[in-house]
């Protein structure tokens, strides 16, 4: 017995001595801001395995299996020598980082320990080495994740940002970059782990301190003027100076970028899959914003399934860091989706919706969404948690140029007799069509889609029964939806039937193609290539498999929507609607397979005053996109006859 104990002791001593030879270093040990790169180097890894991995931890005392993310050492071309390096851009999580290297082999894979995509999570049995701590300069104090939104007042702009502490902050702003004399005091709020509804959001695996969210309203703005601003305090430090163009009530022009279901990319593997295509969406929209020049107000509209954090709170930090180059320049408006709100005990869950609303929020139940954004209006609903804050940003509206924009919630009560229905009815009936001849309604789950997702059939039926009569009666121009991760444009439709071009029924578009990739290509059956799995019905004018976004441009006479693909940054589909409601292009005219002109052609519509600038931007953007693109789905976006089978979204 004693001999066996000694044998076991010396065995573990031997294993320890083998594994203890590894060393790790990081450079630099202090980063300035989110997005800065750290280089992690290691050496002395004995008998390296292609499953050896680098764990990323914040805060530094996190248990081994509570990583932020990981990278396999085999990502380094020299890993087989036992040495290598990996470069990572990091986001400021308001706490320090450490990095740990683990040895892992095929024989140690636990098939029951899986991530969201059913891939095995890495084993933590054999720790080889751990780095010193890495910190961000002014990590707690620095304001980050800056994003703008409109308020209910035409002469205001809201700015929201995050810091590590709740001490006093403000926004200072002005018309001259070095003369920011106007002050707006910021209000700080936060949420806690007990406000979350279930795991992983309320578990130690998914929870990280979200910091303080500050909200300041810049008031008394002149209309159509570029303002400069920064946020922070003299005591704690200031952000960089950003700028925006204020709303202009006298302008007839409306410019917007619109999409759903974008998410964000992470430079590491984590418990849930990141959305690599979201990088291209941000890149092309940023190109378009910069091409507009200095005097045009623009909005971004993200209609649900925002970050796809699903209970892993640091993903919200990654998301806001990714969109800050856009959202610090133009208002970033949102509506709630299933991955922000849904949980099993949500207050409104009628019998017909028993299989519609699940646990897609990962236990967040609308709390981070409600705290991190502040949209116009004052719509609220209870989360269903005794301690939880109310859900906000559910339904609201505002005017911009010639368009009245309306946002609704498909995750909370929208039936006749409810608060949201009353809001929508009153709002649509009170639109001044001489001022805003176009009305655009947006929500997450689609009223119309050729997806055969059985789980959502009941909600589509209820939306057509309760909401569609309001849209038709009040001559809504366009209805935009997400949730299905593809682009699809319908005719001017009512009760599943196309009307005449001049009748003025709403044109419905599904635009959930900004990043989420959980749905594969619609392809014909192998033994029946002439028969698509989901045939395109007569009321579906165009279906596209290319990731991308929508551009909206409108004046008093005409509204144009263009579908821009991420692969090439070019326009793949266009629909134009007159103020009378007549659809004058993009109708069912026998040209379903055609594109509606090149990017330079669209520039004439989109940037009438700056076509030459846009053409240069397109050429530059095309080559940047081509060079930076790592992968491309074969045939995607080339024709609407290359069908894509829409599978059920992950549950």
UniProtKB/Swiss-Prot annotation:
Binding site for Zn(2+): 305, 338, 444, 483
Keywords, alphabetical: Glycoprotein, Iron, Metal-binding, Secreted, Signal, Zinc
One Pfam match: Pur_ac_phosph_N
Organs and tissues of expression: Expressed in roots, stems, leaves, flowers and siliques.
Cofactor: Fe cation; Zn(2+)
Record: residues binding Fe cation: 305, 308, 485
Residues carrying sugar: 32, 96, 202, 378, 432, 475, 495, 640
Signal sequence extent: 1-20
GO molecular function: acid phosphatase activity; metal ion binding
Note accompanying the cofactor annotation: Binds 1 Fe cation per subunit.
UniProt subcellular location: Secreted
Residues given in the record as substrate binding sites: 338, 483-485
InterPro entries in UniProt: Calcineurin-like_PHP_ApaH, Metallo-depent_PP-like, MPP_PAP, Purple_acid_Pase-like_N, Purple_acid_Pase_N, Purple_acid_PPase_C_dom
CDD domains: MPP_PAPs
Cellular-component GO terms for this entry: extracellular region
Quaternary structure and interacting proteins, as annotated: Homodimer.
Family assignment from sequence similarity: Belongs to the metallophosphoesterase superfamily. Purple acid phosphatase family.
Name by which UniProt lists this protein: Probable inactive purple acid phosphatase 9
